[in-house]
Regions:
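Flexible, low-complexity linker and terminal segments
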Residues: 122, 127-141
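A glycine-rich helix N-cap at a beta->alpha junction
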Residues: 31-68, 73, 81
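A charged, amphipathic interaction segment
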Residues: 59-123, 127
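Short, hinge-like loop/turn segments at secondary-structure boundaries
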Residues: 29-33, 118-120
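Long, hydrophobic N-terminal alpha-helical segment
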Residues: 1-29
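Short coil/turn connectors at secondary-structure junctions
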Residues: 7-11, 94-97, 133-136
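Short C-terminal domain-edge/linker segments immediately following a structured domain
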Residues: 14-19, 43-47, 130-136
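A structural signal for short, well-ordered beta-strand segments and their strand-loop junctions
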Residues: 12-15, 100-102, 140
Length: 141
């Protein structure tokens, strides 16, 4: 989002299901990285020179591994001067990015607009989001 905004490209982000934690005031500062089934978790994150070898899933189920993976990620973000998620979302919104919450996810989770961090503009349906971004390049990660 930040690179696109810096190049004059409109940025619109639609948060759904697990992404809702990123915009939820109560959860955004306690986000965790689950190592089980996470293809982004590489052994190099633990300081082991193993190339592209992933952390085995069996290790992810061990007690404390989620906390360990989360600490690794937070330490790496701090080392690279990447802002925390709450601050980054505010930077995006301040720079003109449009942030939206998925209505179906909001309804399923019993959330309301006041549950979200500053910068979230509205709760919209997926169809509304597609109408708003018609003709745009959409990236789903």
């Amino acid at each position: 989002g930040w690179a696109a905004l810096g190049n004059g490209i409109d940025v619109t982000i639609f948060f759904t299901f697990w992404g809702m934690d990123m915009i939820n005031k109560e959860r955004v500062d306690q986000l965790q990285i689950a190592p089980v089934g996470n293809t982004a978790m590489k052994m190099t994150m633990m300081g082991l020179n193993t190339g592209n070898l992933g952390i085995p899933n069996i290790m992810g189920v061990l007690p404390g591994m989620t906390a360990f993976a989360t600490k690794l990620m937070k330490d790496k973000m701090e080392e690279l001067e990447v802002p925390p998620v709450r601050e980054y979302l505010q930077m995006l919104a301040d720079a003109g990015a449009k942030l939206y919450a998925c209505k179906m996810s909001v309804d399923m989770m019993g959330l309301k607009m006041e549950d979200f961090v500053d910068g979230v503009e509205a709760i919209v349906t997926a169809a509304d989001f597609m109408d708003m971004t018609e003709g745009a390049q959409i990236i789903f990660i």
